[in-house]
Amino acid sequence: VTQQRGSDPARNASRVAGEPDRLRVVLIQSSTRTGRFGPTVADWFARQLRRRDLQVDRLDLATAGLPDQLAGHDEPAPIAVRQFGDRLAAADAFVVVTPEYNRSFPAALKNAIDWFDTEWAAKPVTVVGYGTDCDGGHAATQLRQIFGELNAVPIRRTLTITKAWQRFAPNGSWPRRDPDLEAATTATVDQLLWWATALRTARTTTPFIP
C-alpha cells in the first residue's frame, strides 16, 4: 500500500498564477483482454467529460504495468506503481469504465485498486459498466462497496449499458440516439462534478481523517 503522493506542480502553478483550476477526472479503463470493447466506451465517456471543460487523465490497465503481486508494507513500490499513484493522487474524481465478467469486474481492476490507499480517499467515484446480456450492474455494486472501504465516495448515480456492442459504432459514436442513456449520462456527470467540487473544497480547508 502506498502513501499519499506529492502535490502536482502544474496544479500548484495554476493556483499561484490565479488561473482557474479545472477539475481533474481520472478515467480508468479496466478491461485488459484481447479484442476488448472497453476503449470504445472509454472514448465516448471521455468526450462527455471534456465537453464540461474538465481535465481528463486516462489510465489504461492494459498498459499500466502494475505488478500482479503486491509489495510488502516495508518494500518500495515499483516505478510503475509510483507513477500510477501520482496520477491518482492528483485527481479530483474517478470514473471506472468496466465490463462485467461472471457477475463481477476484471481481476486487473481489483489489483489496481489494492495497490493504493490514501490516493482514493475523500474523492468521488462513479462506474460506467457495460456488457452483452448483463449491463455491468453487479460490477458497479461491488465496486461501490470496495471504494467505500477505501474512504472514497461512490456517488449514487452510475451508468450501466447492456448490449454495448449494438449501441456504439467502432469509433465510439452512437449508431442511434438513446435519449434515456443520454439523460442518465448528463445526470451522472452533473452529480460527479458536484461531489468533486464539494470534496475538493473540503480537502483544501480541512485535513481528511481516515
Kindly label every feature range from the protein language model.
Residues 121-168, 179-184:
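Short, glycine-/small-residue-rich phosphate/pyrophosphate-handling segment
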Residues 1-116, 174-186, 190-194, 199-210:
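N-terminal beta1-alpha1-beta2 submodule of the flavodoxin-like/Rossmannoid cofactor-binding fold
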